[in-house]
Design a protein with these regions (language model features):
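Conserved AMP-binding/adenylate-forming
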Residues: 75-77, 92-139, 257
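Conserved AMP-binding A3 loop
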Residues: 78-80, 203, 210-237
Length: 351
């Protein structure tokens, strides 16, 4: 048994679609699982549920198809356009690369439209997303490969070197497909462009595995935290609904990477639940740059760490952030002094 911390529920009325039982078979004994309660009406997730089909494909039925979802300086994709791109990538994964539900796929990249599309395609296809922090080196990537045993990786073209070094020591990772490389033969974009824009979502059980989120390893080697489709959908029904009160008019910005569950929620799945949009810049954030981009993009919700809010405060005070209505902090302890400094600068009580 590998070091796995389950976030999975004990429900499970629908049959699993994941023929590859690698993760399922390595979960701890059921009596060691947490007791997760889904007793509120909005948490009555169907026993058969694919989170991407629910959030992305379901956007059309909710009238959000033409609304923007993924935004960057280079392009903006509506919910309908994003769904088509996700479908093409899912076809590459299952048709061209031969992956089957339950297989793990390593994802390596910073926050970008391409990274978001890749993650969504992996999960829609019933595969297990194993997203990794962009700063990880070959040795750290190797530890994750050892535990997750992915045969395929999707990697930002700017981050290939360390992953290729890890691959040389861990041949189970047979294939690396680069993305964010438009016009490059063999890239994910080139492969996807040759595929049709339709794909039937894998009929996953709600308790099938959606992702392995690796811890930072502060108490030893990183451990894999298991999240099911039900877990992610339940989080979407809780946080953006009750805390943020998110709406389709929200524009989300922030610094946490999609490989970090703080970033995955705040910078992708929570906006999707609300029909909102998320903006990924093409520059490295500095405190001043983030403040200026929030003002320029008219972002309404921001996610970052307490240290960054503290550093942003003087710039926010100087130029003002009239569009911003909610600020979420995580990743480290939030000192009361930082909370008060930010409130004095913006009038916003940090969450």
């Amino acid at each position: 048994m590998i070091d796995v911390f389950p976030g999975v529920s004990s429900g499970g009325g629908a049959p699993s679609a994941q023929g590859d039982r690698f993760v399922h078979d390595r979960l701890p004994p059921r009596d060691q699982w947490p007791d997760l309660r889904y007793d509120r009406p909005e948490l009555q997730i169907p026993d058969a549920a694919n989170l991407v089909a629910t959030l992305l494909d379901g956007a059309h039925a909710r009238g959000w198809g033409d609304r923007p979802l993924l935004r960057s300086p280079a392009r903006t994709l509506s919910y309908t356009q994003a769904a088509a791109e996700v479908n093409r990538i899912a076809r590459v994964l299952t048709g061209e690369l031969g992956l089957v539900p339950g297989n793990r796929v390593l994802l390596r990249g910073g926050n970008s439209v391409a990274m978001a599309l890749a993650w969504l395609a992996v999960v829609k296809a019933g595969l297990v997303a194993v997203a990794t922090m962009p700063l990880l080196r070959a040795r750290e990537l190797g530890d994750i490969i050892d535990k997750a045993q992915p045969t395929v990786a999707l990697c930002d073209g700017k981050l290939l070197d360390e992953l290729r070094t890890a691959q040389a020591e861990h041949p189970v990772l047979a294939t690396i497909v680069p993305f964010n490389q438009d016009g490059v033969a063999g890239s994910l974009e080139a492969r996807a462009a040759a595929q049709p824009a339709d794909f039937t979502a894998c009929p996953t059980a709600a308790d099938d595995i959606a992702l392995l989120a690796f811890t930072s390893g502060t108490t030893g080697k990183p451990k894999a935290v298991v999240h099911t489709h039900r877990d992610v959908l339940a989080a979407c029904e809780a946080w953006p609904r009750h805390v943020l009160r998110a709406t389709p008019d929200d524009i989300v910005m922030g610094s946490p990477p999609l490989a970090f569950t703080f970033g995955l929620g705040g910078m992708l799945v929570f906006p999707m639940w609300a029909g909102a949009s998320v903006y990924y810049p093409d520059i490295a954030y500095t405190p001043e740059a983030m403040v200026r981009l929030i003002r320029e993009v008219k972002a309404t919700i921001c996610y970052t760490a307490p240290t960054f809010y503290r550093q942003m405060a003087p710039f926010a005070r100087a130029i003002g952030l009239p569009s911003l209505r909610a600020c979420v902090s995580a990743g480290e302890g939030l000192p009361d002094a930082t909370r008060q400094l930010w409130k004095d600068a913006t009038g916003i009580e940090m969450t």
